[in-house]
Amino acid sequence: MSLEPFSKSEALTFGVELELQLVNRHDYDLASASPDLLRMLKGKEYPGDIKPEITDSMIEISTGICHSHDEALWQLREMRDRMAEAATALNIGICGGGTHPFQQWSQRQISQSPRYQYISDLYGYLAKQFTVFGQHVHIGCPNPDDALYLLHAMSRYVPHFIALAASSPFVQGVDTGFASARMNSVSAFPMSGRAPFVLTWDAFIAYFDKMHATGVIESMKDFYWDIRPKPEFGTIEVRVMDTPLTVERAAAIAAYIQALGRWLLLDRPFMPVEDDYLVYTFNRFQACRFGLAGEYVDPATGNRGALADHILETSKLLSAHAEALSSEGALDMVREVVEARDADAEWIRAAQRETRNLHETVRRGCGRWTQAATQPA
């Protein structure tokens, strides 16, 4: 099949997807509960969409097309609250976090959709190991060439997104030492990593056609890039974030990405070059391993400094754009997280140090996810 045309979308509109954990209330291990939860939600009114994911222990919520931080936050809260009501009736818990701290991948059940069965047949045990939980943010682009510009310009800031959302320090009962261990599961897939450096849609079509001719890929869904174009939506999709522990933080990170996109598209502060990617894997690793305590090499200057400082410096450049988007509060939340080094991975580790029990840590995570909307993130 050929690459579908790039659809028209309103520039800088955005959408948020969150993959969530479903756990039992006995020992807070993952539960194969998505079919039952979806049945409970059938006929209920809520914005956005709620649908199954690759294994039955996961569920995905996604907003509609949003113009503002407040709109996205309202939609996420509404879906969270409807799901919490259904989960209570089923006696299951729902929580955020990029990995479940102690689940065993071999116990997972692949969802029945043909797409997920195909992935399981193709990738074997990697499909079950892909029971990890991410936040994706779509940004509307006025045309396909602008989408590719934004994709590559925004790639410099991938470490920001990883560190701000990092919430997966534990895997199979072990503290990995990573702030975002989830990304290691994604990296195992052959079509993961960064998108090829092409800046025109014609060149991207030529790349896609070559890849399709080899039989390696069938559609854009087969690319697991950190940021990828989504021509059917007229967006780029940022895919590197762990699912935060609250919808408030998820919405703030999405608004940060929207403001960054506005700055990049309107001001065009630099033109991406292929050498930007010389330090890409180093910066990405630093964010995954150390989170907000990581280092960052500026691709433009080669200067090495603190990732947290680079996020704060960037946030100053975004202030006017956040004001134009009515998302100043979200940008302030991002700054507060960075200044306090208050990533969710640190909350999870602190809960584990206090309880010395990962089951109790997950229980507390469920409470954090379903907290009243008036509570801070």
Curated annotation (Swiss-Prot):
Q: Which UniProt keywords apply?
A: ATP-binding, Ligase, Nucleotide-binding
Q: Which domain of life is it from?
A: Bacteria
Q: Per the UniProt entry, what are the Gene Ontology biological process annotations, in alphabetical order?
A: modified amino acid biosynthetic process
Task: State whether keyword ATP-binding applies.
Answer: yes
Pfam families for this protein: GCS2
Question: Per its record, what are the GO molecular function terms?
Answer: ATP binding; glutamate-cysteine ligase activity
Q: Which stretch is the leader sequence?
A: none
Please give the organism. Ralstonia pickettii (strain 12J)
What is the protein name for this chain?
Putative glutamate--cysteine ligase 2
State the family named in the UniProt similarity comment for this chain. Belongs to the glutamate--cysteine ligase type 2 family. YbdK subfamily.
Q: Which InterPro entries match?
A: GCL_type2/YbdK_subfam, GCS2, Gln_synth/guanido_kin_cat_dom, YbdK
Q: What is this protein's function per UniProt?
A: ATP-dependent carboxylate-amine ligase which exhibits weak glutamate--cysteine ligase activity.
User: Keyword Nucleotide-binding: yes or no?
Assistant: yes
NCBIfam families referenced in this protein's UniProt entry, alphabetically: gshA_cyan_rel, PRK13516.1
**What is the uppermost EC class here?**
ligase
EC code(s) of this entry: 6.3.2.2
